Amino acid sequence: MSKFDLTAKNCQYLDRHLTFPLLEFLLQKNIYDQTSLLKFILETVSKTNMVDYTMDIRERLNMGNELPEELTKRRSNVLVKLKELQTEVAPLMKCMEELKNPDTMKDSKSIVHALQQEFDFKYDIIRSAQKLAKYLYECGNYRDSISYLYICLLVMEPTDKNYLNVLWGKLAAEILTLNWPTALEDLTRLRDFIDNHNFSPIEVLQQRTWLIHWSVLVFFNHAKGRDLIIEMFLYKQLYLNAIQTMCPHILRYLATAVIINRGRRNALKDLIKIIQQESYTYKDPITEFLECLYVNFDFEGARMKLHECQTVIINDFFIIGCLQEFIENARLMIFETFCRIHQCITIGMLADKLNMEPDEAECWIVNLIRNARLDAKIDSKLGHVVMGTQPLSPYQQLVEKIDSLSVRSEALTVLVERKQKAKTQESGEGNWKYY
């Protein structure tokens, strides 16, 4: 299933520490050769200070469980450097502990002024705090790194040349500690900084592309993320432009968010337009599922793509947690679209369209009716589902009628074109044989 695997593309825009969970996930899926993947992880982790993780990978590669002299020396150097940086930063930590209510101060200038007045504070010590935070991060000690990064953000002015690096570091550390509420706050702060800073066009495009990939990790793990990903990726033009220019594969995650978010069906029309525009550069079973269903009205194609979607999602680190929701909502979308064209449906036909057994399909419809999500009746003797109608205002009736006629017209047009194309191919017309 490596054909649809996006790990290599996604990892290009992630910090190396953020790639480790993705690579470990791939190891479990057996999509690639295990030894080659472990060697790649070992090569990547060797660029950090994560000595214990390095040893773990070496053991899994059967390279022995004894610590090589090189790693022993490296661990010793890491501990010495860590002690040195902690000593440098100790005065700042003491000042911050004694400073009253730093969180309530208006801005970094107020905090720096208070520190200078009360503790003879030197701004250069912030550089040491940043180095220590970075060093702890490289050791895999993300929680302690967050503490120092938080202080850096309190004291640093946004004009500081290192401010952007600290914002990125804080977001990465919050993601790696699975602190999603704070990660979302940091994501918003970083996005505001990128959007309002004076970057060159190339720089801002690069920054937005990185932010798009990092934000997927946050959005699919935060309660509000499914709405926020649609707002940012589909309706913030600057980010949509970045997706279309640099990373159209992100459409997989946008499409997934729209499919599982029943309250945002109004976004489907805009999403499908983008998917069609970008289909020449990127497509996968998830984007093709929407095209089959809403562009071609190809229910058989949609059924087959839904089956492929399940395999894609199972092997995608970002969206594997959405699998059941995706299947449920995708089936509902097929059902709703099918019912707009056919008012009376056999359970057998419906089961076929939804990749379900007839008994399972009947039970599924019963649950929809029971949960007041569907106005329909089941005729068990005939094996039919008869769609009901709810009283509508004259205006709503007109809108529904036009909408329904539009859907039916498009479906009929597609069917006629498909049949005509088949006839043309059979007769050999239009092949320009004798040009």
Curated annotation (Swiss-Prot):
Q: Give UniProt keywords alphabetically.
A: Cytoplasm, Initiation factor, Protein biosynthesis
GO MF assignments = translation initiation factor activity
Zinc: present as a keyword of the record?
A: no
Q: Which InterPro entries match?
A: eIF3e (IPR016650), eIF3e_N (IPR019010), PCI_dom (IPR000717), WH_DNA-bd_sf (IPR036390)
Taxonomically, the superkingdom here is Eukaryota
Q: Which GO terms describe its cellular component?
A: eukaryotic 43S preinitiation complex; eukaryotic 48S preinitiation complex; eukaryotic translation initiation factor 3 complex, eIF3e
Q: Where in the cell is it found?
A: Cytoplasm
**Any idea where the PCI domain is?**
219-392
One Gene Ontology biological process: formation of cytoplasmic translation initiation complex
Give the family this protein belongs to, as stated in its UniProt record: Belongs to the eIF-3 subunit E family.
Q: How does it assemble?
A: Component of the eukaryotic translation initiation factor 3 (eIF-3) complex.
Protein function:
Component of the eukaryotic translation initiation factor 3 (eIF-3) complex, which is involved in protein synthesis of a specialized repertoire of mRNAs and, together with other initiation factors, stimulates binding of mRNA and methionyl-tRNAi to the 40S ribosome. The eIF-3 complex specifically targets and initiates translation of a subset of mRNAs involved in cell proliferation.
Q: What is this protein called?
A: Eukaryotic translation initiation factor 3 subunit E
